[in-house]
């Protein structure tokens, strides 16, 4: 849901969160708490963001880097391949899982601000009338 906090008559400033287009890879190992991986699955179900889990037992770091395209959430205690992922343009989040949903959930989504101007050179309703699906 998009929200306009400004309430201006001549402009709409929407703030919304969108699901990422590519899946988020969540890396974990034997030392990662089950609660963390369960919470990652819960957030995936809540937000609709696609999540792929990567275990250090089943996939090497090099294999993970080779297939990563969007974002990697690193819950593993092994060293994160930060340079290799950033060189591919892949976002890496090494922070621990936050206990508060208002802090944790936005980390799994894309933040977007949409501004629609309803004036042209000071003339209200004189500008273009763009249509943006999902905004009212």
Question: What residue spans do the PLM features occupy?
Answer:
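C-terminal segments
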Residues: 1-136
